[in-house]
Amino acid sequence: MRISRFLQTPFISYEDKNMIYIEVAEWDMCNPYEVNIFVDGELVFGEKIFASSFSAMIPCYDEERVATVSITPFEDTPVDKDFLVVPQKHWEIPLLYSSHEDLGYCAYIEKLHYECYEYLKKAIELCQKHESFKYMIEHYWWLDAFDSYATDNEKALLKKLFAEKKIDLSATHSGVHTSWASSEQLARGMYFGCQEAKEKYGISPKCAFYVDLSGASWSVVNCFAKIGIKYIGILANSFRNSKPNTDIPPLFWWQDLSGKERVLLWNQRSYRQHGLDGIWCDTLRQYPEGSFYFDTTKMLKTERWFSERISQIEPCAYDILPISFYDDRESPTTMLLTVCEEMNKKWKYPKFTMEIPSVFMSRLEEKYGESIPTLRGDISDQWADFATIAPRWMSNKRKATRMLYDIEMLSTIDSVVNRAKYNQKTFRDIYFKLCEFDEHCWATSSKHPQKMHRHNIEKVKRDTVESSVFELEKMRASLCPKADNGEEISIISTIPQGRKNHIYGKKGELVPKELKHQILPNGAVVTEAIELGGVGAIRAKGILPYKESIEIDADFIETDFYKIRVSRQTKRIVSLIDKESGAEYIDSQARFELGQFVYAYAEQKTDPNLSFEIPKKTDFKLYEGEVAFALTQKGYEEQSGAIINTQFVFYKHERTIDVDLSYENATGLIGDFYDRYKKNYFFAFPLKLENPEFYTELHAGEKKEGRDYIPLSANDFSVTQNWVAVDGENRGVAIYTRDMPVFHLGSIKYNRFNRDFSENKAHIYLYASSNRCNNLIYTSVEECQAKYYLSILLYNGKHDDIVPTWSNENDHGLIVSKQSILNGCMMRLDKGNIRLVSLKRSEKESDAVVLRFVETEGKETECGLELFFNPTKAVYARNDEIDLEEITGLKDNIIHFNAQPYSYTTIKVYGDFEI
């Protein structure tokens, strides 16, 4: 016989004895054997054993000792082996019990509100009945549901339990994909859980937990820290874990891009801790209250599980091991409380408790502080490419966020200058809806009953954005009414920096008479560029556009910046040369063409071996007008049934290249019950650069692919705010995307599941569509279509001080209106690297407006802001509008403030304009 394992466990009895596990090999399984354990020559354990593994209790020691384990087989000689016994920690095991509901997944959305109320009411009752019961509300949406039905007494009880730290609130709106939010929405989405929850229930949340998501945008660190959030929780995602697996600590300081802010992040292994779920819930997934049992078998298995888990993380500095154990749509019960009580009856340590995150995360911070490792980088949320399953809805959502910026700004100026009504509740409700749209559960694949899931996905997703856009368009019609032909018009800019851009509109909308214009083949109208000095407007006489694009028979065109050659035989662009550098930008050796539709599909949903189909070309034309050259391509892809239309616009006097892409009749997306990601559409942009380095825009700043990444999950796609860029040696290319924010960079790499990013080709692929959830969305020919608007910029040098400004001008194009509340230049910012993301009225102070900015180039910057009124006071504020220090040196309508690199800066400005 031999001893095959010696494990010192964390379990300490009330007699101060430490439990150890011993496993033996080559036992005859017929006769007992004798075991004696000696420490410093003293016998501390002696028994006869009839098992291949057993536990033994030995004294606890304050310093390392050598334990000699002596095994004497039946009628044989002893076998001795020495093991090191170390002082054992007094472990704490806080168990996190949380609500969890995927919006639109588990119940009809109209019924879910009341279910949330019922579940939270039950949790309140258990907190009152049991002193040690603790519970977390996973997000504000759940609290809002409770608030809709609760009595005044129930609300008072909840407020009391918040104060007693028996119930916690995660400050998130819901389980949102943070990368889908605009820069302003990322902050405004926290107003609900911070501002409104504090006003109603007196709680100031310290944690933001994504209880069913594998990551969050790097920008949440800076944004949330400036709202008072100190702790973030995410969840491991077993389906798309990165390969090779990496040793990322489960607890670390997550530092922002600026290096000045950080939050403490806990990466939960799962929300029903793997291994424990099979022990505690061995006969039922969820036990109704009063039916859970914790017998000797469960006790022994629990002891073994925690012994193994702690042995995996030792040696370490910690003695606190938080464990998540909650489930989808679970009515609160005392199951975890029973586990804690039974374990604590038997064992002095570890100490098992039910605890809320703001308490145990605070304990970890206080106890270990600077010894906790610090990591920097983005953490991919590996379901964020769900955006591709409903491209038309995603396009509408992104349209709403752009409109919100413009309309909220114009409404604020109108309310200050003209004392007009300000629709604060409308803006609040729209942001609430957009956060609902971003909620992570899109009823993945087709679940039963399909009728319910289709109903929910239309309510939670489609209807939220359609109703938001409808409200915003009504407000825009009031603020920016349309003019009749020949009337004076205003050309409005909502960007506080000077700019020179063309107007991009629709046929039938007026354009300035003195500007050259052109109706493009797809019906859009463009003008030559016009210059504006900041937020403001200029007046001009308006006319209906009438100058059509004329088809030309050429295979070579030239603008001020580019030389473009086409092949009419192969119906494609074959050369794109930058005149300044003389460099060719199209990779002629690439598999796909510039702007080409690519149908990528797999036989199995996780198969990394993709097959590719490209369209047959049916038409190719080249047009010219006063402003630009336009190239149109049409094609038909047989396998998917997609009819594809493409339009490139090369402006004669601008570097920007506009691209309109669309497909329709893609009925191949219909079908494939339950399969994920088998059918995918991309548009290819195979560019040619030396030693390419890829960059993706974040809410505040950017990430360099392959460097700024914490590899907790696979790095196969990128979700941008608005642009991606690839720098070469001395030049580069950027793509602005209006409708779809998901890209594959370097290559199409679906199901590769690799954490590494190593690409030597400057190829960019817009991930346009996927058939996941197809039985819920792609159910008719009408649904199987989408449109995408992109802009391409070829630049010399690096992207840093060029692309962010260019992208922002694309995102907030010039507005044409019959009249404008703006007169001349009314607001101007003197630095180009500071992007205004919001101008709004204060939520609480009727005599204040709030401006929020993000820095885009990684530079600490002092800014001068010229306002449209004379302020009486200005302060820096948290991102939830709580005043911080005062800004000094106000002069007339000028404010000077400081902005940190890649950071949010919020200022609140007071004036004599109370409504």
Model segments located where?
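CE4/NodB-like, metal-dependent polysaccharide N-deacetylase domain
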Residues: A187-V220, K226, W305-I323
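An acidic-aromatic substrate-binding cleft motif
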Residues: P78-C116, E125-L126, F133, H173, ...
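C-terminal (or distal) subdomains of carbohydrate-active enzymes
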Residues: F11-D16, V220-A225, L235, F239, ...
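Short, solvent-exposed turn/loop segments enriched in Gly/Ser/Thr/Pro and often Arg
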Residues: Y97, M136-F146, T172-G175, A208-S217, ...
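Mature N-terminal, pre-catalytic/accessory segment of carbohydrate-active enzymes
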Residues: M1-D102, E110, Q900, G911-I915
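Acidic, His- and aromatic-enriched active-site or binding-groove loops in soluble protein domains
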Residues: N153-A171, V221-E261
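Metal-dependent polysaccharide deacetylase catalytic core of the NodB/CE4 family, i.e.
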Residues: L103, E131-F133, I137-V211, K260-R269
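Catalytic grooves of carbohydrate-active enzymes
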Residues: H100, K230, G259-L479, Y636, ...
